[in-house]
A protein has these predicted regions:
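N-terminal secretory signal peptides
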Residues: 1-34
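Cap/lid segment of the alpha/beta-hydrolase catalytic domain
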Residues: 113, 139-162, 272-277
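N-terminal cap/lid segment of alpha/beta-hydrolase-fold proteins
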Residues: 64-99
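Short beta-strand element of the alpha/beta-hydrolase
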Residues: 102-111
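Gly/Ser-rich "nucleophile elbow"/oxyanion-hole loop immediately N-terminal to the catalytic nucleophile
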Residues: 149-188, 302
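N-terminal export signals
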Residues: 23, 32-58
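Primarily recognizes the serine-hydrolase "nucleophile elbow" in alpha/beta-hydrolase
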Residues: 169-229
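Short beta-strand/loop motif that positions the catalytic acidic residue
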Residues: 234-236
Length: 303
């Protein structure tokens, strides 16, 4: 039995300007006070600014498509060496419980709030599809995900960004080198994690079998893009002007470099449309993007 989503609010329940304002808050471009100030004009008809703020917060129960204790999976917390990063990086490792032989690996990279329950569930979804999924927590060396999104965003900003990037590089290499891995790994990331997937494609070159980036920042230097050898699948939201607006130039650069890349822009969707814990979730776009992701990994990582 899946989560009860009967009371889920949809993006269409909110003015787009309010969703854009919340996007700025989530990404640290404005603080809570700034959000409240900008949201005042929407607090009408009995609505309060505090009520609007609360309605936009994630409900992690909605994201539990695969229970934490699902008997079909083996899960554990592991710590990986990261000598070029923060020394170590902790994470969540998921494997099929009845796996026989080596497994293809998928690195799952979180948004800008660390390893929250939504990303853990994504790892479990991949585990049920026959992958060994590893979801590192970029905030693990400063205490790890604190269980509160606002605190998580603040904690995330305390970690040196260059070292955190190296932590994900180390995690990918660790996953690829595991004796129970086939040596073929892919990576999927969301928001901040989408940007990391693009960076992984540059860093690992042919050692990455496939990369899938959901609304992730793109590299711009031609010498970096020339290093990309992995096939890329890139998902963008039409209403995410900043990130999606840079996709055409990235597409042109990838083609010039001879890279294999496919991008989709999902009409009417907001940044974060795959995250099924918030009102920005777009069910149709999320399901289509996820099926495309699964098919892509099955072709390039499992195949």
């Amino acid at each position: 039995m899946g989560p009860d989503t009967s009371k889920r609010r949809k993006a269409s329940d909110f003015p787009q300007e309010l969703l854009d304002l919340f996007h700025l808050y989530v990404h640290g471009e404005i603080d809570r006070r700034g959000f409240f100030s900008g949201a005042r004009k929407f607090a009408v008809g009995g609505l309060t600014v505090a009520g609007l703020f609360e309605a936009l917060q994630p409900n992690f129960a909605w994201a539990e498509q695969v229970p934490k204790d699902d008997a079909r999976l083996k899960t554990e917390r592991v710590t990986v060496p990261s000598p070029q990063g923060n020394g170590t990086v902790g994470g969540y490792l998921v494997r099929p419980a009845n796996a026989a032989g080596k497994l293809p690996g998928i690195l799952v990279v979180h948004e800008n709030r660390g390893l929250n329950p939504y990303i853990e569930d994504v790892a479990r979804r991949l585990g049920l599809l026959g992958y060994m999924a590893f979801a590192p927590d970029g905030t693990s060396t400063v205490g790890g995900y604190p269980g509160d999104e606002e605190k998580a965003t603040a904690l995330f900003r305390t970690v040196d960004s260059a070292k955190m990037t190296q932590d994900f590089f180390a995690a990918a290499r660790w996953l690829k080198a595991r004796p129970d891995c086939t040596g073929k790994i892919g990576a999927v990331g969301f928001c901040y994690g989408g940007g990391i997937v693009n960076k992984l494609a540059v860093e690992l070159g042919p050692d990455l079998a496939a990369g899938v980036a959901f609304y992730g920042a793109q590299p711009t230097a031609p010498e970096d893009i020339a290093k990309i050898k992995a096939p890329l699948l890139l998902h963008y939201a039409a209403l995410d002007a900043g990130i999606t607006g840079r996709w055409p130039a990235y597409e042109t650069a990838l083609k010039a470099a001879g890279a294999t890349a496919t991008g989709y822009v999902y009409e009417g969707a907001n940044h974060g449309f795959h995250n099924d814990t918030t009102p920005r979730y777009d069910e149709a776009a999320a399901k289509l993007a996820w099926q495309r992701t699964v098919d892509f990994f099955n072709k390039y990582v499992k195949g």
